[in-house]
Amino acid sequence: MSITAERRTALISEYKQSETDTGSPEVQVAILSERIVNLTEHLKTHKKDFHSRRGLLMMVGQRRSLLDYLKRKDQARYQSLIERLGLRR
């Protein structure tokens, strides 16, 4: 369900804005998206795992908030991120 340290490092290096960037909205959204995909796969096999489903909904809400923030602050970065991640919006 969780992502490995190597995968997290790869996501950070792919979406970072500067050399020391680990907490920009782009990086946070990329990590959350990876966790959401993993948890969705888990829930496909464990349909009655409602505790994990609640965690999934919280992660989706957090990602939505970060995307809304990024859209408000910098429309170009927002568009670039959703295209790179393949999100619907």
UniProtKB/Swiss-Prot annotation:
Pfam family, one: Ribosomal_S15
SMART domains according to UniProt: Ribosomal_S15 (SM01387)
Single annotated GO MF: rRNA binding
Keyword Aminoacyl-tRNA synthetase: no
UniProt keyword list: Ribonucleoprotein, Ribosomal protein, RNA-binding, rRNA-binding
Gene3D superfamilies: 6.10.250.3130, S15/NS1, RNA-binding
GO annotation, biological process: translation
Keyword Iron attributed: no
GO cellular component: cytosolic small ribosomal subunit
Main function: One of the primary rRNA binding proteins, it binds directly to 16S rRNA where it helps nucleate assembly of the platform of the 30S subunit by binding and bridging several RNA helices of the 16S rRNA.
HAMAP family membership: Ribosomal_uS15_B
Summary of subunit composition and partner proteins: Part of the 30S ribosomal subunit. Forms a bridge to the 50S subunit in the 70S ribosome, contacting the 23S rRNA.
Family from the record: Belongs to the universal ribosomal protein uS15 family.
Protein name: Small ribosomal subunit protein uS15
Gene responsible for this protein: rpsO
